[in-house]
Structures are given as structure tokens and as C-alpha cells.
């Protein structure tokens, strides 16, 4: 089976590349935006045909949440048109499958209990809106595809909250971090292993949307404090409210995801957030 992983140089794509070594029965093709432009329909169609691709793990996304507010066309090109082009190419492939990564930003963040896959979506920013349109394209397609919504992704690869906090913690005596946004982080390595685990699963007659993040509930403030503690960095973390840290794009105040469906449907256990964070920090520091 030939599998295409888009967004291969991002956090998740990089983790899949490392973890895929354990899956020798598959042929993996890893491409980033420079080597494969998913916004060009003919390019993606030709690639999938020439390489006999039957499964796509779509990690490609425009994820610059604040920039998206002023770069709407760029966000739409990847998050909407890119998805449309992948679907159009896969339609011509027999028994094709798609694993697509989406986001907690499709919700408005006003819930007080973890979001289920069946809850109403109401994105409050351009990034979330474009990701939701991408979801709708998949839901309305004939492709056997599943959408995995995730949140607060970090990794030893790329730029993310964990690495930023570690760097700033070494440079400064104290940092202000938001305490009134609640959710759960996702170690990209755990998500990568989920994507690989799903490769041989039958997507027919299954739910189309699943939620996945690490287990636990915390704020960005809690997360930052734990990063400093586990990394043994002497930096004081001060809690601030969202209103004290204005950004171009609004963030959901509450984005905890209910993961019951994926745990029950695929009989999986999800690692606790602190255990995964500990593992990631160890890799970063080594």
C-alpha cells in the first residue's frame, strides 16, 4: 500500500516520518509544500496517479492563526482548496482512504463540558472557519475518510508552545501566561502513532469525525508551569487573563475535546498529557 503524507516537514508530519519506520509493510511518500503543492489540482492528481497512492494522511494546513485574519486567501488555498484537490484526486482511486487533521478551533469555546463530535460548530476566526469548510468537503464526499480534530499540538520538531516556553524561560526571570483558556495539549508523536494505527482499519460504516488529544484538563498557565518544572528551568510563571494579551484572532476559551468515541470505536488508550510532555522535553533536551 502506498501512502502519501502531506505537510511532511510540520510537527505531525515529522513525527509520522520517524514512527513510520515500524510499519515496513507500507510504502510512505513524504511531501511538503515545496515538493508537492496541494493547492494545484493537476499537480496533486498527477502525483497520486503516478505514485499509485491509495491513502493520504493530510497534515498540510495553514495554521498561522493570527496571520490568517489578514491572509484569508492563503488560509483558504491550503485549508479548503487543498482538501478539495486531494478529494478530487482520490475519487479516481479504487478503495482510497483519507485521514485528515482538523482542529478544536471549529468550536466557539463557550462550552463548559468537553466538546463531542456531534456538537454544533461555530468557528470564531478565519483559521477555524477555513478548517471547517475543509471538514464539510470531506463529509460531503464519496471518499472513505475520517477527520481527526485535535488541540494544542506540540512536538520536538518545529515551532510550538513547549519549545517557545523553554527558550523564553532560559532568557527571562518571569513570563506572563494566559490562565483562562482551558483545553488539553496533544503530543504530535502520540497523534502520529494514532494515524499509523488507523491505516489498516476499515473506515466504511464508521463515524466521519473523531476527537483526539492527550488526557487531562489544564490551562496554558498550568502547561507553562509544568514545562518549567519538567525542564528544570528557573522561571516564574504569572497568570494573566486573555483580555490582557490581545491577539488579532480570537481563541476559544474552552476547547476540551471529548474523546469517548475514538477510544470506544478503536479500543485505544490515550496517554496522559504530563507523561507525554515529559517524554517530549527529554527528547528536546537531549
Segments from the language model and where they lie:
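Conserved C-terminal active-site "lid" loop/helix of NAD(P)H-dependent oxidoreductases
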Residues: 219-221, 225, 241-280, 284-285
Amino acid at each position: 500500500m502506498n501512502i502519501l503524507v502531506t505537510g511532511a516537514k510540520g510537527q505531525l508530519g515529522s513525527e509520522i516520518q520517524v514512527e513510520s519506520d515500524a510499519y515496513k509493510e507500507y510504502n510512505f511518500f513524504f511531501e511538503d509544500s515545496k515538493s508537492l503543492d496541494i493547492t494545484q489540482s493537476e499537480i496533486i492528481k498527477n502525483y497520486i496517479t503516478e505514485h499509485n497512492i491509495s491513502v493520504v494522511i493530510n497534515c498540510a494546513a495553514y495554521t498561522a492563526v493570527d496571520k490568517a485574519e489578514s491572509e484569508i486567501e492563503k488560509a483558504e488555498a491550503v485549508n479548503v482548496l487543498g482538501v478539495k484537490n486531494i478529494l478530487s484526486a482520490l475519487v479516481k482511486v479504487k478503495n482510497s482512504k483519507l485521514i485528515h487533521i482538523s482542529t478544536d478551533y471549529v468550536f466557539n469555546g463557550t462550552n463548559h463540558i468537553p466538546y463531542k463530535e456531534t456538537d454544533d460548530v461555530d468557528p470564531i476566526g478565519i483559521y477555524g472557519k477555513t478548517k471547517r469548510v475543509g471538514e464539510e468537503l470531506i463529509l460531503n464526499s464519496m471518499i472513505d475518510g475520517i477527520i481527526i480534530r485535535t488541540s494544542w499540538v506540540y512536538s520536538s520538531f518545529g515551532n510550538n508552545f513547549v519549545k517557545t516556553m523553554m527558550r523564553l524561560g532560559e532568557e527571562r526571570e518571569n513570563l506572563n501566561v494566559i490562565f483562562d483558556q482551558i483545553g488539553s495539549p496533544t503530543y504530535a508523536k502520540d497523534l502520529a502513532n494514532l494515524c499509523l494505527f488507523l491505516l489498516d482499519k476499515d473506515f466504511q460504516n464508521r463515524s466521519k469525525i473523531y476527537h483526539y488529544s492527550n488526557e487531562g484538563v489544564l490551562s496554558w498557565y498550568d502547561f507553562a508551569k509544568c514545562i518549567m518544572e519538567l525542564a528544570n528551568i528557573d522561571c516564574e510563571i504569572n497568570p494573566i487573563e486573555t483580555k490582557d494579551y490581545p491577539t488579532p484572532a480570537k481563541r476559544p476559551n474552552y476547547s476540551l475535546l471529548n474523546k469517548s468515541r475514538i477510544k470506544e470505536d478503536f479500543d485505544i488508550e490515550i496517554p496522559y498529557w504530563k507523561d507525554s510532555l515529559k517524554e517530549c522535553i527529554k527528547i528536546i533536551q537531549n
